[in-house]
Amino acid sequence: MMGGNMSKMMKQVQKMQQDMLRLQEELGNRTVESTAGGGAVKVVANGRNEIVSIEIKPEALDPEDVEMLQDMILAAVNEALKKAQDMISQEMGRLTGNLKIPGLF
């Protein structure tokens, strides 16, 4: 009886691993975006926590205030990465039934 349960559990673990790999690939194709400065800076990140694009509108370019542009870029990047991490956590939670598995994501 114990062997049957162990076999069933191992199959479930293997299925979860396959599902996780599929989800990781899928998340790499999904994106989130964030803006700063009223849309002057837009950053897009994917579900691998990678920044895939940064757009800066011409009106954001002020040679007299480079620091403001740097702050807007930093704010938009950080927010995009946070949104990407939230998306990853939400999707992984669905997959694992909200189990907290250390080091998983």
Swiss-Prot record:
The keyword Zinc does not apply. It is found in: Cytoplasm, Nucleoid. GO terms for cellular component: bacterial nucleoid; cytosol. Keywords: Cytoplasm, DNA-binding. GO terms for molecular function: DNA binding. It holds the Pfam family YbaB_DNA_bd. Gene3D superfamilies: Nucleoid-associated protein YbaB-like domain. Belongs to the YbaB/EbfC family. Binds to DNA and alters its conformation. May be involved in regulation of gene expression, nucleoid organization and DNA protection. NCBIfam families: DNA_YbaB_EbfC (TIGR00103). Homodimer. This is Nucleoid-associated protein PTH_0052. It comes from Pelotomaculum thermopropionicum (strain DSM 13744 / JCM 10971 / SI).
